[in-house]
A protein has these predicted regions:
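Transition segments tied to proteolytic processing and entry into folded domains
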Residues: 18-20, 30-195
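Bacterial N-terminal signal peptides that target proteins for export
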Residues: 9-21
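Intrinsic, low-complexity polybasic segments
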Residues: 3-8
Length: 195
C-alpha cells in the first residue's frame, strides 16, 4: 500500500543516491589519474628540462606518422626563454595523439594545448631533436591573467589553484597543493633550480 507523496520521496532519494554515486565515480577517476602520476616539484621539472619556455600557442597541426599513429605539433611563439637551449623565436612541441578527421587518440594525462593559450612549458628534446613536454601534463602550466590587476597566475594538475570544473581539485586539496602560484614565483623557482 502506498501513500500520497511516497513515490516522489522515493524518486528524490534515488536522485540523491545517483548523484552521490556519480560524484564518487568522478572523484575516483581523478584519484586514479593522480595515483598514476608521481607529482614532480617545480625544481625537479626545471632540473630535468632541456628548456623552459614561456610562450603563446599560435598554431597546432595533427598528422599521421609512417606507422599510422596520430601525433600533434604545437607551435609556440616564445615570450621568454626561462632556461635551457635557445631555439629562435618559436618552439615546436610534438606529442602523441590528437584529432585527425573522425579519429581521436588521447591520453588523460597528456597536456592539452589550444591556440591562443599562454603557457609555460618544461620540455626535453628527443633523439630527433623534437621538443616533448616533460612529465606529460605536469610539464605544462596554463597562464591566466587576473582581470582587474593583470597579475599572471599559473597552474597545472599539481601546482597552483585548480580550475573550478577540474575533478582533480579533490586530489590537489588532499595533497595540500591548492595555493595560488604566480608566474613571477614560477620563474624565480625555475631560475633558482637551474643554478
Amino acid at each position: 500500500m502506498s501513500f500520497p507523496g511516497q513515490a516522489s520521496n522515493l524518486r528524490g532519494g534515488m536522485k540523491r543516491r545517483s548523484f552521490a554515486l556519480l560524484t564518487a565515480l568522478l572523484a575516483g577517476a581523478a584519484l586514479g589519474q593522480a595515483a598514476s602520476q608521481v607529482p614532480l616539484s617545480i625544481e625537479t621539472l626545471a632540473a630535468k628540462a632541456d628548456a623552459v619556455v614561456h610562450g603563446t600557442v599560435v598554431r597546432m597541426s595533427c598528422q599521421r606518422d609512417d606507422g599510422g599513429r596520430i601525433f600533434t605539433k604545437v607551435h609556440l611563439q616564445i615570450i621568454e626563454q626561462m632556461n635551457g637551449r635557445q631555439r629562435g623565436g618559436t618552439l615546436v612541441i610534438v606529442q602523441g595523439g590528437g584529432v585527425l578527421g573522425r579519429r581521436i587518440a588521447r591520453s588523460p594525462i597528456q597536456p592539452t594545448y589550444r591556440v591562443g593559450a599562454e603557457v609555460v612549458v618544461f620540455v626535453v628534446f628527443n633523439s630527433r631533436g623534437e621538443a616533448v613536454t616533460l612529465g606529460l601534463n605536469q610539464g605544462k602550466f596554463d597562464v591566466m591573467r587576473q582581470p582587474k590587476t593583470g597579475l599572471a597566475m599559473v597552474r597545472n594538475p599539481f601546482h597552483g589553484l585548480a580550475k573550478r570544473d577540474d575533478p582533480r581539485a579533490v586530489v590537489k586539496r588532499a595533497l595540500g597543493q591548492t595555493k595560488p602560484l604566480t608566474l613571477a614565483e614560477l620563474k624565480r623557482r625555475v631560475r633558482r633550480a637551474a643554478k
